[in-house]
Design a protein with these regions (language model features):
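Short beta-strand/loop motif that positions the catalytic acidic residue
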Residues: 199, 205-207, 211
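Conserved alpha/beta-hydrolase "acid-adjacent" motif
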Residues: 212-220
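Short beta-strand element of the alpha/beta-hydrolase
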Residues: 52-63
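N-terminal cap/lid segment of alpha/beta-hydrolase-fold proteins
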Residues: 8-51
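Catalytic nucleophile-loop/oxyanion-hole region of alpha/beta-hydrolase
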Residues: 68-76, 83, 88-125, 252-255
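Mobile cap/lid helix-loop segments that gate and shape the active-site cleft of serine hydrolases
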Residues: 19, 35, 165-195, 201
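C-terminal catalytic histidine-bearing segment of alpha/beta-hydrolase fold enzymes
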Residues: 220, 227-283
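Primarily recognizes the serine-hydrolase "nucleophile elbow" in alpha/beta-hydrolase
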Residues: 109-175, 187-188
Length: 283
């Protein structure tokens, strides 16, 4: 279902790509859970927040559930923070040391930590948007739509933005998914589409029409299910963009390839807008 992206290549990419002005990392390696993978970074705009609190984005990266490090995604944190958000990027435990649902449980623990500490850094713990790419989009979708993981904290999730995510697939088909979901039991219970219910958070579901790693039909299926229960779901399909390209389009040199950053930032601003805010107002 998914193909891993080399951690070393992403770290190198993150190192050499131009950094967005107007944003900085303010927390590195804070512990949200025990162990070396239970660490989280925070990024914030450099401009003053004023009297209010900023909405918060929690970004979950992909990597087939078996690879990845937050150190390769600073370009995402800075890009979104420069748009006015407090951005959290956690690591999480990986296959083969763990299997489902451990990586979802880690995402839930990270969200709870963010809610407990966001205000210390100018973030609003009641206005969170979950954003994810690939396997991270799956993790984020499960947190957004399956109430088992966040419980009462799910009320703070105002929206979900998934980039090239798998939401409706056979978890026992193929070696990568099988390794991640071995022993999971009922297959449908592992799928985000199975947990959508009335009152679910709105979604932005973005894919590239050249994605051969995670089929765009996953996003179509989730959008249809959300629409059926009355939840707004926006589908974006970028021409000539592949599975990795939808992520790298967030970086400065490649933003002209697809308006991924603009779309995610506009969606997050809209779903977290406070009553009385002018339409389209950025955080």
């Amino acid at each position: 279902v998914l193909v891993a992206t080399g951690c070393s290549r992403l770290i190198m990419f993150n190192t050499v790509v131009p950094k967005d002005e107007g944003a900085r990392r303010i927390v590195r390696d804070a512990a949200y859970a025990p162990g070396p993978r239970g660490r989280i970074d925070l990024y914030t705009p450099t401009r003053p927040v004023g009297a209010g609190l900023r909405p918060v984005i929690v970004f979950l990266y992909g990597g087939s559930w078996n690879s990845g490090t937050k150190d390769g995604y600073g370009f995402v944190g800075r890009a979104l923070a420069a748009r006015g958000f407090l951005v959290a990027i956690p690591d999480y435990r990986l296959v083969p040391k763990v299997r489902y649902p451990a990586f979802v449980e880690d995402g839930a623990a990270a969200v709870r930590w963010v809610r407990a500490h966001a205000a210390e850094w100018g973030g609003d713990p009641a206005r969170l948007v979950l954003v994810g790419h690939s396997a991270g989009a799956y993790n984020a979708a499960m947190l957004a739509y399956d109430p088992r993981w966040l419980g009462a904290d799910r009320a703070a999730i105002k929206g979900f933005a998934g980039l090239a995510g798998p939401y409706d697939f056979d978890p026992f088909d193929g070696p990568i998914a099988s390794a991640a979901f071995q022993g999971a039991g009922e297959a449908r219970a592992t799928q985000p589409v199975s947990h959508v219910a009335p009152g679910a958070p709105p979604a932005l579901l973005a894919t590239g029409d050249k994605d051969t790693t995670v089929r765009p039909a996953n996003s179509d299926s989730l959008a249809a299910r959300l629409t059926a229960v009355g939840t707004p779901a926006t589908l974006r399909r970028y021409p000539a963009v592949g599975h990795v390209g939808i992520l790298t389009a967030i970086a400065q040199p490649w933003r002209g390839r697809a308006p991924v950053l603009d779309d995610v930032a506009a969606f997050a601003a809209r779903v977290t807008a406070e009553p009385g805010s002018p339409p389209g107002m950025r955080p």
